[in-house]
Structure formats: structure tokens, C-alpha cells
């Protein structure tokens, strides 16, 4: 009871920090996950150190303090004896109990009863386990016999493992062959599509020529009729002038003239009807929606017992699993491709390595004029499609709408501050933004590196709040659905939640959770906050620019302060984060991560797994955001621009 009461008062978070590796988030053990001490005093498991040491040259960089431990082998590092003592003490009583005699529990066993399957000491064997009812033998002999049995089973399992590996290799060969066939069919479809486009272009040219001939013929008839109408109009005007002159004559002269003049018929030569050519569109040769072709399935049998040799297997295969066929096939043969499993589609796309997001255009270039950037470091998109960019090199926040540049926000000191600084000949304070976000109330939150503060502006550029209390080095900022701002404190190791009023400034602030060097932060529609931990460095950051230092792993916390989903440094067997420099969450709750050292944009679905959205075209991505219309904006720091990509992923179901 006393032990249970003592266990109930343990701080589980503190115990987790001591007994878990902060990189792989696995508990320390005395073997593979043995705790090792770096020269800086931090503890990392042996398995993670092996991976870090294999990918480095000069030593191991601590993910917490960035100090380098210069070693060439793990034997140069000492064990953390304190952690090992805790592990050994926690399992001491259980381990000792497992070693004792099963009968009395007080003496070490020397005999093994094969009939009962228990280990016994000599007194217990002589008392209760005598032959012929029991078959006993020394523990060492029984153990050797059991080891021989296990050795035989191990040999059979290894043979089975080898067979499974061969089958797996054959399956990979089949997968490569299928991918090649898919691409070939897609290329064939593209050729057929281009041929039909050429046919459509020729058909349009012929159609427009025929339409032009009809238009020319009708124009001649209309022009001839217009000519006759103009002549009749001139004659009518001439007769009007003639009669006006007659009306103005004197009475005697008017009466003396002969009145037997006949009135000419002006409209006699005008045709009553016009013969024109009417035109209408007659659809020929096609009924229903236009389709280039359809994917047709054929049965195909692959012998998994035989070895599969990639291209040789593809060349020797007699029938294809998917073929391209023209639209003149029978309806029974049609099998639309969308019936394929979403999970299989996902795996095939990941294997093909095709970039999922297409580049559309880029916005901005290096400069100081409106719409230009100089080392931009943060990006945010509002619900009204307004884009906010933290332009660090130009000491400003730029706001863009759908039409282009809208306005900029700079730091404007008070009158007395400006007067005193100008009088003393000092430089005026600048706004050095590190991160920017806007809440649902239209307030813009900015973390300022100039004085390590949180500043809140209106859209008009008026500063309504400036908060420095409890903040050592504020960096990342995001806005919760409730309108609160969440700010990360890199040196303080905390995430702070601020409630800001437009008239009163910061009215409430509290600590959301603690973390190891949290830097970049984002949140989803439910209020779950994702933040980076540790310290990852961009390998090309030769000038030690702090804004190019990123995260080492990703953690999450709910609005109630409960820790949630974690993505460790080694997010895959052969993949790891190098320098996380930006994050955002899409409408489905999937996490999108920008790694400035990998120069890639990674996608982590809510149900698990990962994929690479953008592999090429980026020099140093430091910020990402999604627009309401489904476009992915990537802020490229060293290219001084915002690059716009398409983002319309297929909605896969979780397998």
C-alpha cells in the first residue's frame, strides 16, 4: 500500500523526461537503448546516437544546446549511471523473484522438473519431485536441451525469413514492372490525346472556313440591298427638295405649270424578299461525352516462387495487367480505374516519386520597394485570402490582397521617443519581425526580435499591445480559433497563450505547456497546437543566422494543455528532420512541414504515414500557408519571394 501511495504522487512528466530518449521517445534500456551522456550533460539513447554519428563528420550536435561532442565512436561516451540505477531499482524485486526456486522461493534452483515444467532447489526436488512420477535433470542440461530446440526452430525461421525476403524482392520487382506499365499506358494516352487535339484543330479550321464563306455570301446580299436603299433614299430627298421649291413659287407661276407630271415609284426596284443562307451547327460523328480511352483490366498471374528480375521479367511477360484501348471496344470489357484501392494508389504515388504539387507562379523579388522582399521569414494567410509576410530585412510586415500589394506595417515610436533619439543622434527603433499571424478579430500578432516582445497591430498599422513580461526569446506565433495568440519562447522553453483586446491590450496570459526549445508553431481548426522542438541547423547556414535555425522534432498540445500527437526526429526508417522551418495544417487536419535543409515540403496525413509534396525548385523554404482556394504558398527566404503551388490532394481513406 505504501509503495502504491508513493507511486500515485510521482510526477509522470518529470519521470518521462528522465527515462525517455527525447529524440525517438522510447524508454531507456540497458541494451540497445542504453542512456549515453554527451559532453554538454544531456542524455540520448545509444540507438539515436548511432544514427546521428553515422550522418555527421565532426561529431554529434546536441539537439538541445547545439554544442558539438567530438567523438569517433560511442565507446568514448560514458553511461548515465543515474538513469541506469533508476531502471535497475525499478525492476530489482521482480528480477530477483524470477531467479528463485518456484517451490520455496528462498533458494537458487539447481534442478528442473520436466514433468511439472518448474525449476527447483535440491530440498524441494527430494521432497516432492522424486521419480518415477517426475523426471528431473540439472538446470544446465535442461537449458542446453531447450537451447538446442530453440536453435532448430531458429534455423527453420531463418530459412523462412530468407524465403520471405525472396518473395518480398519478387514483389518489389512486380511493383516496379507495374509502375513502368502504368507510365507506358499514360504516355500512350497522352499521344492519343494530342492526336485528337490535332484532329479537333483541323476540324475547327474547316468549320471556321465554311462559316466564313456563308458570312461572305450573306454580306454581299446585305450590301447590295443597302446600296439600293441608299439610292432610293437619295431620290426621295431630291423629290422633297423639288416639292419644297414648288411650294415657295408664286401663285401665278405655280398654276401656269403643267400638272400632268407623274410621280415616280421609288421602291419599285427594291426586292420584296432577300435570299440568305442560314447557318446552324450539326453534330456529327459523336454522341455523349468525349473520352480518349479507358483503362482495361486483364487477368495476369505472377509466380512468386520464381525470382523476378525487374526489366527481364517485364520483357518476358506475355500479357499486360493494364492496357490502353480505343473507344471502339465493347462495353463488357470496360473497367474504370477509379475502383482501385486508395491505399494502393497512395503507395504507387509514393513509389513513383512524382512531385504532387505543381508550381504555378511566384510573387516578389529582392528589393525594398512595396511588393519586394529582403530575407522574408514568416508567412500567414487569412480567411479572406489576405497574405501577410514578415519582411525581416526591410523591417516591416507587408499585406497583400487578391489584387496585389495592399499596405505595410512598420514600427512607429511615440513622439517623445522619436524626439529624444533624434536629438541624441541614435537610430530609431525598428520592427524586426520573426513571425506573424492574424486572429479572427482582425488583429495582427508579431514577435519582434528588436526588443524580444509580442506586438499586436490593427490592419491600419496602429499598435494596440506590446508585451515583454515572462518572455525571454519569443519566436513563433499562431492564432487559435477563439482569437487568442499562442507564442513560443525558445530560450524559456514554454508556449504562452495571450488574450488581447483591441482597446485594453493584453488582458490575460497563461502558460499552455513546456517544451524543449519550441520555435515554430501552428494550429488546426479544432485548436490543437503543433510546435517544433530541439534545435536543427541548416547545413548551408554558414553565417550562423538564427532565423535559419529550425526544429528537430514536432509535438502537439490541445487547448486544455494535454500533450497529443508526436512526430520524432526519425519520422521514417531512413528519413529524418534536418531543419524544420515552417508548418501549417490543411482542412483535413493533415500537417504540412517545410524543411529548409532538405529543401522539401513534407506531408503528414492525420491517419499516419508521410509523403513529399515538393522536391525541387526551393532554396530555403521558411514558411508555408494554404489559401482558402486550395493553393499552397511557400516562402523562400534566399530567393526572396513567395512561390505558389497547386494543392489538390486526393482524399484517401485511412487503410
Swiss-Prot record:
Alphabetical list of InterPro entries matching this protein: 6-blade_b-propeller_TolB-like, NHL_repeat, TRIM32_Bbox1_Znf, Znf-RING_euk, Znf_B-box, Znf_RING, Znf_RING/FYVE/PHD, Znf_RING_CS
Disruption phenotype: Deletion mice are more sensitive to inflammatory death upon Salmonella typhimurium infection. They produce much higher levels of inflammatory cytokines including TNF-alpha and IL-6 and show much more serious inflammatory damage of their small intestinal villus. Production of IFN-beta and IFN-gamma are however reduced at 1 and 3 days post infection while an increased macrophage-associated iNOS production is observed.
Alphabetical list of Gene3D superfamilies matching this protein: Classic Zinc Finger, TolB, C-terminal domain, Zinc/RING finger domain, C3HC4 (zinc finger)
GO molecular function: identical protein binding; myosin binding; RNA binding; transcription coactivator activity; translation initiation factor binding; ubiquitin binding; ubiquitin protein ligase activity; ubiquitin-protein transferase activity
Coiled-coil annotated spans: 139-198
Pathway assigned to this chain's UniProt record: Protein modification; protein ubiquitination
SUPFAM superfamilies: B-box zinc-binding domain, NHL repeat, RING/U-box
Keywords, in A-Z order: Coiled coil, Cytoplasm, Metal-binding, Phosphoprotein, Repeat, Transferase, Ubl conjugation, Ubl conjugation pathway, Zinc, Zinc-finger
GO cellular component: autophagosome; centrosome; cytoplasm; nucleus; striated muscle myosin thick filament
Binding site for Zn(2+): 101, 104, 124, 129
Region (Disordered): 327-347
Zinc-finger recorded as keyword: yes
Post-translational modification, as annotated: Ubiquitinated. Phosphorylation at Ser-56 by CHEK2 under oxidative stress, activates the E3 ligase activity and promotes ATG7 ubiquitination leading to positive regulation of the autophagosme assembly.
Reaction(s) catalysed by this chain's protein: S-ubiquitinyl-[E2 ubiquitin-conjugating enzyme]-L-cysteine + [acceptor protein]-L-lysine = [E2 ubiquitin-conjugating enzyme]-L-cysteine + N(6)-ubiquitinyl-[acceptor protein]-L-lysine
Enzyme class: transferase
Location within or outside the cell: Cytoplasm
Zinc finger (RING-type): 21-66
Induction record: By interferon alpha/UVB treatment.
Subunit architecture: It self-associates. Interacts with DTNBP1. Interacts with PIAS4/PIASY upon treatment with UVB and TNF-alpha. Interacts with AMBRA1; promoting activation of ULK1 through unanchored 'Lys-63'-linked polyubiquitin chains. Interacts with TICAM1 and TAX1BP1; these interactions target TICAM1 to TAX1BP1-mediated selective autophagic degradation.
Family statement: Belongs to the TRIM/RBCC family.
Stated role: E3 ubiquitin ligase that plays a role in various biological processes including neural stem cell differentiation, innate immunity, inflammatory resonse and autophagy. Plays a role in virus-triggered induction of IFN-beta and TNF-alpha by mediating the ubiquitination of STING1. Mechanistically, targets STING1 for 'Lys-63'-linked ubiquitination which promotes the interaction of STING1 with TBK1. Regulates bacterial clearance and promotes autophagy in Mycobacterium tuberculosis-infected macrophages.
The protein, known as: E3 ubiquitin-protein ligase TRIM32
Amino acid at each position: 500500500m505504501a509503495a502504491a501511495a508513493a507511486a500515485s504522487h510521482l510526477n509522470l512528466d518529470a519521470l518521462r523526461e528522465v527515462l525517455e530518449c527525447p529524440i525517438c521517445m522510447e524508454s531507456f534500456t540497458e541494451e540497445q537503448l542504453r542512456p549515453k551522456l554527451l559532453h554538454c550533460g544531456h542524455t540520448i539513447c545509444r540507438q539515436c546516437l548511432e544514427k546521428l554519428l553515422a550522418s555527421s563528420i565532426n561529431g554529434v550536435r546536441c539537439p538541445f544546446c547545439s554544442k558539438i561532442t567530438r567523438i569517433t565512436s560511442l565507446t568514448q561516451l560514458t553511461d548515465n549511471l543515474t538513469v541506469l540505477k533508476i531502471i535497475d531499482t525499478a525492476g530489482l524485486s521482480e528480477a530477483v523473484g524470477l531467479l528463485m526456486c518456484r517451490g520455496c522461493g528462498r533458494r537458487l534452483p539447481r534442478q528442473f522438473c520436466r514433468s511439472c515444467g518448474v525449476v527447483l532447489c535440491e530440498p524441494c526436488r527430494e521432497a516432492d519431485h522424486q521419480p518415477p512420477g517426475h523426471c528431473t535433470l540439472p538446470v544446465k542440461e535442461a537449458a542446453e536441451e531447450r537451447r538446442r530446440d530453440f536453435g532448430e526452430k531458429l534455423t527453420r525461421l531463418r530459412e523462412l525469413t530468407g524465403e520471405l525476403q525472396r518473395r518480398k524482392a519478387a514483389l518489389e520487382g512486380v511493383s516496379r514492372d507495374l509502375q513502368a506499365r502504368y507510365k507506358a499506358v499514360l504516355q500512350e494516352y497522352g499521344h492519343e490525346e494530342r492526336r485528337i487535339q490535332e484532329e479537333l484543330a483541323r476540324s475547327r479550321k474547316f468549320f471556321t472556313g465554311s462559316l466564313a464563306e456563308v458570312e461572305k455570301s450573306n454580306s454581299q446580299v446585305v450590301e447590295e440591298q443597302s446600296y439600293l436603299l441608299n439610292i432610293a433614299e437619295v431620290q426621295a430627298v431630291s423629290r422633297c427638295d423639288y416639292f419644297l421649291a414648288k411650294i415657295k413659287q408664286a401663285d401665278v407661276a405655280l398654276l401656269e405649270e403643267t400638272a400632268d407630271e407623274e410621280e415616280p415609284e421609288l421602291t419599285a426596284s427594291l426586292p420584296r424578299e432577300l435570299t440568305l443562307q442560314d447557318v446552324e451547327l450539326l453534330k456529327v460523328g459523336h454522341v455523349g461525352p468525349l473520352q480518349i480511352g479507358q483503362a482495361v483490366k486483364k487477368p495476369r498471374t505472377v509466380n512468386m516462387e520464381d525470382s523476378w528480375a525487374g526489366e527481364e521479367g517485364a520483357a518476358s511477360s506475355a500479357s499486360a495487367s493494364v492496357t490502353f484501348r480505343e473507344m471502339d471496344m465493347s462495353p463488357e470489357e470496360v473497367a474504370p480505374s477509379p475502383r482501385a484501392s486508395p491505399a494502393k494508389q497512395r503507395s504507387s504515388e509514393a513509389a513513383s516519386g512524382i512531385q504532387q504539387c505543381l508550381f504555378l507562379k511566384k510573387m516578389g523579388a529582392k528589393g525594398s520597394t512595396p511588393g519586394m522582399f529582403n530575407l522574408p521569414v514568416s508567412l500567414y494567410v487569412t480567411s479572406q485570402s489576405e497574405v501577410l509576410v514578415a519582411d525581416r530585412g526591410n523591417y516591416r510586415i507587408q499585406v497583400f490582397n487578391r489584387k496585389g500589394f495592399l499596405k505595410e506595417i512598420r514600427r512607429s515610436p511615440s513622439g517623445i521617443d522619436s524626439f529624444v533619439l533624434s536629438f541624441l543622434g541614435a537610430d530609431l527603433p525598428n520592427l524586426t519581425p520573426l513571425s506573424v499571424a492574424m486572429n479572427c478579430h482582425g488583429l495582427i500578432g508579431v514577435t519582434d526580435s528588436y526588443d524580444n516582445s509580442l506586438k499586436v497591430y490593427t490592419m491600419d498599422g496602429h499598435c494596440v499591445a506590446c508585451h515583454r513580461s515572462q518572455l525571454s526569446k519569443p519566436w513563433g506565433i499562431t492564432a487559435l480559433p477563439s482569437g487568442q495568440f499562442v507564442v513560443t519562447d525558445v530560450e524559456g522553453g514554454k508556449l504562452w497563450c495571450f488574450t488581447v483586446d483591441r482597446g485594453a491590450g493584453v488582458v490575460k496570459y497563461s502558460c499552455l505547456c513546456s517544451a524543449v526549445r519550441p520555435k515554430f508553431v501552428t494550429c488546426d481548426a479544432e485548436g490543437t497546437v503543433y510546435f517544433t522542438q530541439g534545435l536543427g541547423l541548416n547545413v548551408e547556414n554558414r553565417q550562423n543566422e538564427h532565423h535559419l535555425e529550425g526544429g528537430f522534432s514536432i509535438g502537439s498540445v490541445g487547448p486544455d494543455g494535454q500533450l497529443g500527437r508526436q512526430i520524432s526526429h526519425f519520422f521514417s526508417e531512413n528519413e529524418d528532420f534536418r531543419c524544420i522551418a515552417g508548418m501549417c495544417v490543411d482542412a483535413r487536419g493533415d500537417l504540412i512541414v517545410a524543411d529548409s535543409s532538405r529543401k522539401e515540403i513534407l506531408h503528414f496525413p492525420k491517419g499516419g504515414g508521410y509523403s513529399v509534396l515538393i522536391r525541387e525548385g526551393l532554396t530555403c523554404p521558411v514558411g508555408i500557408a494554404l489559401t482558402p482556394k486550395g493553393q499552397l504558398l511557400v516562402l523562400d527566404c534566399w530567393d526572396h519571394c513567395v512561390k505558389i503551388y497547386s494543392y489538390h490532394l486526393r482524399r484517401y481513406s485511412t487503410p
